[in-house]
Amino acid sequence: FILKDGNSVTDQSGRGNNWTVGGGTLTKTEDSPSNNFCTLNSLDMVYGNSSLSQGNNTQNQTAASNHYAFVNGTLGFNSGKWYWEMKCVSGHSDNWYGVGITSTQCTANNNWLGQNADSYAIYGYSYGGGLASTYTGGTRTNQGVSFTAGDIIGVAVDCDNMAIYFSKNGTWMSNASSVQGVPTSGSSKTGSFYTISDPATRKYNAYGGFYLPSVCYYDARTAVQSVNFGNGYFGTTAVSSAGTNASGNGIFEYDVPTGYTALSTKGLN
């Protein structure tokens, strides 16, 4: 039997071996034997009372002592241009929602996202509409934008020109110098939040010569955040109006910058 193209219970092989749903609802996925999208990695987590659900694309934090609940993705990269999205689904007014990239050093050393020199993150502080902050090497930089529950944060990593950009609800954020991000600006890195270190410099050390996508959460209360690496869903909720994606690889809420693609086995190959 063959199930494809959204026909989740209808056999497309011509043999009539149709399926029936025994209970619950089905969530369509873009994953296939020839193209697997990145997910969050249940074997690469530190801190907090976190669990993963919904295809390992949702991080659920339960009430605990104040901890950074930190989890990496399953696919890494050391070149190319990559885009994904994180949605702050729910939480308390004191929540910090974080997203970015890191080497494996963070989880290996039980660090939080942005604590190491080869780790780059943006955190949105919900309380009172507080401004977001970026971190690398444990150093905090306040940014001129805030985000909170319901917002969708886009991440664009240009690993050819060593730059990282963040968007909020489809608009590229301005960095600490008040320059709006332009992910397609190439070597000029216009509005990039950081010039990231070249992963090739770590090629032969214990932490590997690549970056991983990461999400992190800080607070003592419950919260939920979901990632969309290209399957077109935040948890079980489909994107409301898919943006353009010239690569044709993956479905996202907002437009994928020209030259960028989803982090998947097809994208990597």
Q: For each of these PLM feature ranges, what is it?
A:
Residues 1-269:
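PRY/SPRY (B30.2) beta-sandwich protein-interaction domains
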